[in-house]
Structure formats: C-alpha cells, structure tokens
Curated annotation (Swiss-Prot):
<dbReference type="GO" id="GO:0006351">
    <property type="term" value="P:DNA-templated transcription"/>
</dbReference>
<dbReference type="GO" id="GO:0003677">
    <property type="term" value="F:DNA binding"/>
</dbReference>
<keyword id="KW-0808">Transferase</keyword>
<protein>
    <recommendedName>
        <fullName>DNA-directed RNA polymerase subunit omega</fullName>
        <ecNumber>2.7.7.6</ecNumber>
    </recommendedName>
</protein>
<dbReference type="Pfam" id="PF01192">
    <property type="entry name" value="RNA_pol_Rpb6"/>
</dbReference>
<keyword id="KW-0804">Transcription</keyword>
<comment type="function">
    <text>Promotes RNA polymerase assembly. Latches the N- and C-terminal regions of the beta' subunit thereby facilitating its interaction with the beta and alpha subunits.</text>
</comment>
<dbReference type="InterPro" id="IPR006110">
    <property type="entry name" value="Pol_omega/Rpo6/RPB6"/>
</dbReference>
<comment type="similarity">
    <text>Belongs to the RNA polymerase subunit omega family.</text>
</comment>
<dbReference type="GO" id="GO:0000428">
    <property type="term" value="C:DNA-directed RNA polymerase complex"/>
</dbReference>
<comment type="subunit">
    <text>The RNAP catalytic core consists of 2 alpha, 1 beta, 1 beta' and 1 omega subunit. When a sigma factor is associated with the core the holoenzyme is formed, which can initiate transcription.</text>
</comment>
<dbReference type="InterPro" id="IPR036161">
    <property type="entry name" value="RPB6/omega-like_sf"/>
</dbReference>
<dbReference type="GO" id="GO:0003899">
    <property type="term" value="F:DNA-directed RNA polymerase activity"/>
</dbReference>
<keyword id="KW-0240">DNA-directed RNA polymerase</keyword>
<dbReference type="InterPro" id="IPR003716">
    <property type="entry name" value="DNA-dir_RNA_pol_omega"/>
</dbReference>
<keyword id="KW-0548">Nucleotidyltransferase</keyword>
Amino acid sequence: MNKRPLIEQALKRVNNRYELVHAAAKLAKDLYETGAESYVTEEGIPLKKTVISINEIAKGRAVILRKE
C-alpha cells in the first residue's frame, strides 16, 4: 500500500506538512482515548490510529480548527 498519495491528498486540506502532522497526532490521540474501533484493510490488516487519522483528514471527514 503506497501511503504517498494519501498524504498528498491530505496536504490539499491543510496549509503545510507541520499542520498535517499536528492535526493527525491530535486526532490519533482522540481515537486512542475514546477507544475507537480500528479499520481493517481488504487484506485483513488492521490500520493504526495515525493512518486512520490521516485518512480521515484526506477524505475531509475531520474538521481542522485553526487559531487566527
């Protein structure tokens, strides 16, 4: 599975890589704290919370709030 296109897609929704890392880390932490279920790939491999969070950002399911 090539992760590069997923990251490029997520970068279209944020200003820069650092903001993406920060947002993905916060979302992954929230997923761990709430005990959210892990997604499983078609091959039966469970995805890590960090990959799930980047995927959610890339698909526009996660709202990123910015301090102005």
